[in-house]
Amino acid sequence: MSVRPLSTPLRQAVKHLRSLHSLSRRSRPLNPPQCLRQQHRRAGTFTTNASSLFRQNPISVSLAFLAILAGAGGLGYANYLYKTYITAAFHNYPEPVAQKLRRALYYTNTELNAQEAIKYYRQALQVAQEVGMDPFSDEIIGVKVQVAKLMEEIRQMGKAVQVLEFLRKDCLEWLRQAGEQEHNRVKRTRILAKVVGISVKLGELYGSPEIYQRDLAEERLVWAVETVLKERQRRDTIRVTEGMSEEALVEVEGPWMTDSETGAALEALAHTYEEKDQHYLASPLFLQALNLYPTKDCHAVVLMNNLASSLAQQSPRAAAAVDAYASSATITSLEAPTGPVATRESLIQNASTWAQKALDVAATVQPPTRNEECDIGCAVATHNLAEFAEMMGRKEDARRKYVEAISIARAVGFEDGVENSSARLRGLAGFGGRGGKHTKVDAPTG
């Protein structure tokens, strides 16, 4: 029996198996460590290229990097501005009203076009009425005040006055009809404070050179001051009689004007009386306003200087009643006061005392609280002390103070002070020159 025939099929089978094992295989994937090493190599290549690029073009690469940072920062800041000044500014308005106001403010603040701005303000007020907004809300009153402000900015003082007078009239009518209702107590306080502010602004506008109606200015300011003082007295009476704390009173009646706001109304009326040379009325108002400011405040320096100037320019008879006016709750008469006649020397001495107090207070105020009012106030107070010394016949003291005032004014960049003190010094030395009225301080603007 032969076994030879089996060898061929076996060899063929083995050959077939070998052919199966010889099929092409896919390359094995990189294991995880190899992948990580490859990524590191690529990262290293990028870092190397960046370093090489920086070495070749250090300025260009730095500028490009700064430009990218600036662009990213600009986008972030633009988003902040949009949310803060575009969206948040109008969140109390219904969207149809807000749309009109955005256009109005664009033509007010960005591309000044009074005609277009007024058109959109009117449309905003019309839409506000249609959607049922309260015409005496802070938002609607604010729109009307903004219209008056726009008129003032383009020097249309008459139209600004007209807008504010209409607004004042409407508010007073609401106070007359609904202000005494029990459920309107908080709203009454808020609207009354608005009318006081509007009246003070009207007093300022009536006193502007474009209009210059001093009687109307005085009328509006007297009303504002009397209203402020009467309301303060009324609230004090309620607090005492009902045994309420200030917090409880605010909850029931609403917040009233701050001391600073009250002082501003008193000061505005005082300046009006000064312009009319009614210093016996201006002095107590300056004194009352001063009592409402903290002793270490730069504006207190301004008030002390103006009080000193006003005292020095009073007639002796009128000065006798200053304290009575200062302690009164209301201003009830514009007639000249009567009483024992003060001497000229006592008036000047009182004025000197207040000027020196202004210097003492200014010396205690340090940055960041200290501002331009303190710096200019020092120059003015020193100049006034020189004038008071000159009026009392103390020529050498006056000369020394004038020189000191010039030095202070020059150091703080107060050119008017340099000019005024230099003129008085020349007059004192007998080289000519004319002195004017006593220097007073106005709060710096801008």
Q: Where in this protein do the model-derived segments appear?
A:
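Single-pass hydrophobic alpha-helical transmembrane segments typical
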Residues: 47-89
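Fungal C-terminal region signature
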Residues: 300-446
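N-terminal mitochondrial targeting presequence
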Residues: 1-60, 446
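Acidic, serine/threonine- and proline-rich low-complexity regulatory regions
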Residues: 250-254, 290-297, 364-375
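Alpha-helical junction/boundary sensor with strong preference for TPR arrays
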Residues: 128-132, 171-178, 228, 232, ...
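Intrinsically disordered, low-complexity juxtamembrane tails/stalks of eukaryotic membrane proteins
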Residues: 87-281, 285, 300
